[in-house]
Amino acid sequence: MTHQQPFIAVIPARLASTRLPNKPLADLGGKPMVVRVAERAREAGAQQVLVASDAQSVLDAARDHGFEAVLTRADHPSGTDRLAEVAATFGWSDDTVVVNVQGDEPLIDPMLVRDVASHLAAHPDCAIATAAHPIHDAADVFNPNVVKVALDARNVAMYFSRAPIPWSRDAYLPHWPDVATMPPPAFPVHRHIGLYAYRARFLRTYPSLAQAPVEQAEQLEQLRAMWHGERIAVLITEHAPEAGIDTPADLARVQALFRPGSK
């Protein structure tokens, strides 16, 4: 059983989105999306819930619903960089656990948020903890929008990739390059869940780390930490989380769930 770890939840929320403008303020059952996410973080038991944004309208929406909000710079290349600014602003102690709850995940399971924080506390040799779940469909394995993680014997990440990892030579080569005929994986393949817990001392060093070639190639910010020698503990959950909101179709799907009478 995992120990209940005290933690702070930070919700980075960018107003600019190419596929879904003003996404943090999208209405979900009478409340902005960013507020729905903050409510989930509060349900997870966070000691403090902070919304971090470069847009005053997002900060106002959070404060109007009783949540703390902090203004951040507009030029951050990633959510982790935004969290690093918040950590520097508040001066949290080195061992403070800070969980990055994505601002477009209004259906995130509060228990998963809590468990990832506890997972970091259980791995003092790791700077970051995250989560993953098994996938069994070849279409997911070969989908570049599904990020996979390869794990060592302790479930510490060895690599994250949009490519199919681990690559099953004997199973896949006879079908390559016809992805449609690929068999389901006969070995554990894990999909990364974009939920992170950090130690505050790592967040303070993150902005000084040069971007890594693999980070730029894969467009995966967690690879910067690994490139510079940091370890990432991965919590395995058997339950796939609800999908986040990236497109108008995603928004319509989730809005339907928040309508009165929906289940």
Curated annotation (Swiss-Prot):
- Going by the entry's taxonomy, the superkingdom of the source organism is recorded as Bacteria
- Which enzyme type, at the first EC level? transferase
The pathway where this protein functions is: Nucleotide-sugar biosynthesis; CMP-3-deoxy-D-manno-octulosonate biosynthesis; CMP-3-deoxy-D-manno-octulosonate from 3-deoxy-D-manno-octulosonate and CTP: step 1/1; Bacterial outer membrane biogenesis; lipopolysaccharide biosynthesis
Record-linked Gene3D superfamilies: Spore Coat Polysaccharide Biosynthesis Protein SpsA, Chain A (3.90.550.10)
* Subcellular localization(s) per the UniProt record: Cytoplasm
The entry's keywords = Cytoplasm, Lipopolysaccharide biosynthesis, Nucleotidyltransferase, Transferase
Classification via InterPro entries: Cytidylyl_trans, KdsB, Nucleotide-diphossugar_trans
Q: What does this protein do?
A: Activates KDO (a required 8-carbon sugar) for incorporation into bacterial lipopolysaccharide in Gram-negative bacteria.
Per the record, the similarity remark reads: Belongs to the KdsB family.
What is this protein's name? 3-deoxy-manno-octulosonate cytidylyltransferase 1
Origin organism is: Burkholderia ambifaria (strain MC40-6)
Task: Give the gene that encodes this protein.
Answer: kdsB1
